[in-house]
From Swiss-Prot:
This is Large ribosomal subunit protein bL19. The gene is rplS. GO terms for molecular function: structural constituent of ribosome. It holds the Pfam family Ribosomal_L19. One of its GO terms (cellular component) is cytosolic large ribosomal subunit. SUPFAM superfamilies: Translation proteins SH3-like domain. GO terms for biological process: translation. This protein is located at the 30S-50S ribosomal subunit interface and may play a role in the structure and function of the aminoacyl-tRNA binding site.
Amino acid sequence: MSGKNNIISQLEAEQMTKEIPAFAPGDTVVVQVRVTEGNRERLQAFEGVVIGKRNRGMNSSFTVRKISYGVGVERTFQTYSKLIDSVSVKRRGDVRQAKLYYLRDLSGKAARIKEKLN
């Protein structure tokens, strides 16, 4: 059984070649997503706060939350998806929890996150 597991982990390691910057929950990130409309393809930026991260090798994902026209929008991205063109960190947030789901219940200034100062 371990031989098969080695093959799977080797194949996953080959596919996880994308360079993604280190970011954590609380950070504000800009995710450039490839969007296909008809036969055209363009990049769409999704900027928001990372409220959760799931580290599972090839199956890693992260959730980004933003407020768009007064409505909270959350989007979960597969970290190594081919639809993600790039991820850039705009600012580092200083939080103590791994999952920031409590931000869903907050609005306005209460939902702000303190910036990390180093």
